[in-house]
């Protein structure tokens, strides 16, 4: 993978890019979750998928190698959406497929109205909600949830929090998750929590209901943070295959815990889109 950065409104945003892809294939833009980084996508980008498709994975402000946001607003969903759309503009990606994990999925939905020419969207670990009141139904209670919105986090707290990313009893080594969690600017977590609690995000139900592009919802069967029953109640015309796609045995991070299943589903979604430039 190639590492680079761009300036967006004076702020340096780092990103990784797969070394292959192009031709008539779509560009895939990968958006990581809370207290993670672009490197969570490294196995996907370094494998067959990254060799077929041009993949771009950004570090959100305050995460990975990107600079911290200039103010708390940069850690809200609108602030992150501005960073995402700014990156696409700087890299001249006109028709992306946006793939978002957890917070990254919420960002993808926030940005969708700003990306009318996007080819499609894929989210997982990211239930569409219309208001803060719906969060109690969409998200499952978990003892580690508090750390996801805390400025100061110990290594033990980060380890407990990242264990919620995988299925109970999973054999996946969460060391990389822990390192990224501890490297993230604490203000990113508190800023996100404060802004989301105050309702500073768009009506995601209305956004996905109005989409004309295909919109896939993937879900790890053993996700400890997201309520599958809530997801299954959602219906909207753009929903890919008409239902949530469940990955057996995986938790909140199926792209790392069930990489073959995840890549297969994502590849099927890309195939269904057809070549880049195909009229819909």
Indicate residue ranges for each PLM-predicted region:
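Gly/Ala-rich beta-loop-alpha elbow adjacent to hydrolase catalytic centers
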Residues: 100, 104, 108
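Short N-terminal helix/helix-N-cap motif within the alpha/beta-hydrolase-1
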Residues: 38-43, 65-68, 132, 226-227, ...
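Conserved alpha/beta-hydrolase catalytic His-Asp/Glu region
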Residues: 132-137, 151-209
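Conserved HGGG/HGGXW glycine-rich cap/lid loop of the alpha/beta-hydrolase fold
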Residues: 11-68
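Conserved loop-alpha-helix segment in the C-terminal half of the alpha/beta-hydrolase fold
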Residues: 48, 212-250, 256, 261
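Flexible "cap/lid" loop of the alpha/beta hydrolase fold
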Residues: 109-113, 117-151
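Active-site loop/oxyanion-hole signature of alpha/beta-hydrolase fold enzymes
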Residues: 57-99, 264
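N-terminal cap/lid segment of alpha/beta-hydrolase-fold proteins
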Residues: 1-12
């Amino acid at each position: 993978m190639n590492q680079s950065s761009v300036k967006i409104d004076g702020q340096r945003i780092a990103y990784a890019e797969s070394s292959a892809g192009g031709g008539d294939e779509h560009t895939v833009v990968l958006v990581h979750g809370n207290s993670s980084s672009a490197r969570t996508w490294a196995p996907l980008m370094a494998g067959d998928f990254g060799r077929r498709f041009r993949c771009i994975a950004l570090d959100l402000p305050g995460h990975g190698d990107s600079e911290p946001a200039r103010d708390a607003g940069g850690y809200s969903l609108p602030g992150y959406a501005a960073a995402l759309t700014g990156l696409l503009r700087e890299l001249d990606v006109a028709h992306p497929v946006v793939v978002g994990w957890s917070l990254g999925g919420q960002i993808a939905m926030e940005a969708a109205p700003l990306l009318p020419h996007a080819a499609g969207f894929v989210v997982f670990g990211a239930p569409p909600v219309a208001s803060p009141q719906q969060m109690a139904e969409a998200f499952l209670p978990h003892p580690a949830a508090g750390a996801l919105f805390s400025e100061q986090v110990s290594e033990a707290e980060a380890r407990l929090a990242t264990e919620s990313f995988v299925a109970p009893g999973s054999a996946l080594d969460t060391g990389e998750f822990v390192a990224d969690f501890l490297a993230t600017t604490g203000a990113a977590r508190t800023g996100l929590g404060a802004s989301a609690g105050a309702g500073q995000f768009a009506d995601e139900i209305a956004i996905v209901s109005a989409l004309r592009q295909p919109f896939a919802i993937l879900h790890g069967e053993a996700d400890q943070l997201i309520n599958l029953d809530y997801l299954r109640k959602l219906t909207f015309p753009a929903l890919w295959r008409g239902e949530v796609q469940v990955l057996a045995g995986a938790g909140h991070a199926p792209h790392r815990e069930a990489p073959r299943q995840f890549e297969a589903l994502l590849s099927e979604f890309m195939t269904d889109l057809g070549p880049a430039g195909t009229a819909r």
